Amino acid sequence: MPKYPFSPPVLDAMPEELAELYRGLEDTLLTEICSRLKLRDEPNEVTVQDIKALRSHGVDLKEIEKAIRQTTGISEKKLNELIDDVVERNQKYYTEGIDLARATQPDVLVDATTIDAIKRQTQDAFRNITASMGFLVDAGRTMLPPAKAYQWALDAATVKVESGAISYGQAIKEAVRELASGGLRVVDYESGHRDHVDVAARRAVMTGVSQLCSKYTEQAAEYLETPYYEVSAHAGARDVPGRSPWSSHKEWQGKVYSTRSGDIYPNIYEVCGLGAVDGLEGVNCRHRRNVWVEGVSERTYTDEQLDHIDDGLGCTFEGKTYTAYEATQEQRKVERTIRKLKREKTAYNAAGLTDEEQAVNIKLRRLNAKYKAFSKAAGLPEQRERMKVLY
């Protein structure tokens, strides 16, 4: 069988262009809102009347709507291209595999109706992102649409200035920091969780891609009348035991399984948790299963190679020891912090808060240096594209 085109690293990189697009939208909206919080007067001289006058001007909704509309249009185009590519590469892979198995090619492996349904579902997920997104404020208790976030900042400043607690300048610093820190979020209506907009975009892409790949895999297995699948493998796989017997993905990755019990290979449902949220092809899982034809297919990794897949990864850094999996999690954590600081820098710059912007710049330089040193120590490539905030 030819090599399956959607390896874990390929799957991990696929959503990044669209995730980056939504980070750019977040940056644009932050700039649009925070730039309108500036007043010409010295902060200590600003009165409540000045703030109310500023509030009456509001934010130009046309600019916000234009930014969202442009992002939606670009994302739909890129999403269609991505899905068409996934379909084409799956079709090519399984056509070659069926030829090697000396079987007659089917007219259609996955019908156009099924593909269109998955495409529409994925497009709907992206429309939901722009329809439900908002900025997280009030210490995470409230999520406001972008246009209302501006009024919230001024209302909060009015209350604080009227009480005599702090000046307008200090109130705006707090509001700007909170807007940037929480960032642009999207509500997951099933779980109620509020994801960052780029995380929601990545998940929408991965769900669509996973559904398409699964359809092709299952249809090919049915056509070839095989109950066997080979599971992909990657370095730094989850190796932490959990509630489920399949929680440690490292234990079962890279091997061959059957959909039947008592077969020559272990059961894929019992060992890998296929179909479970925390199992194979579940939430945040980059592993895929590929059709295995006994006597034709060859394993991608030997057992010995799997035993050494994490060699050279992981490290001891600043007094703490990390496994390969823990190192990838720590790297992601630092990336999220860098993105947060970049949002703050953008917001402070837009609001004309020069001192705060410079302070964030210092933090960014230090954290970038730590990120580079940690990635090198852990043997991990730097994922700079994950930290981009577009300008």
What kind of feature is each model-predicted range?
Residues D195-L306:
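Acidic, glycine-rich two-metal-ion catalytic cores of nucleic acid-processing enzymes
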Residues M133, V137-Y229:
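Contiguous, non-catalytic segments that form substrate-binding/exosite surfaces or channel walls
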Residues R185, K255, A351-T354:
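A general structural signal for well-ordered secondary-structure junctions
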Residues M1-A175, E304-Y391:
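N-terminal leader/targeting and assembly helices and adjacent pre-domain segments
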Residues I166-K173, G183, D195, V199-Q211, ...:
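Conserved structured core elements
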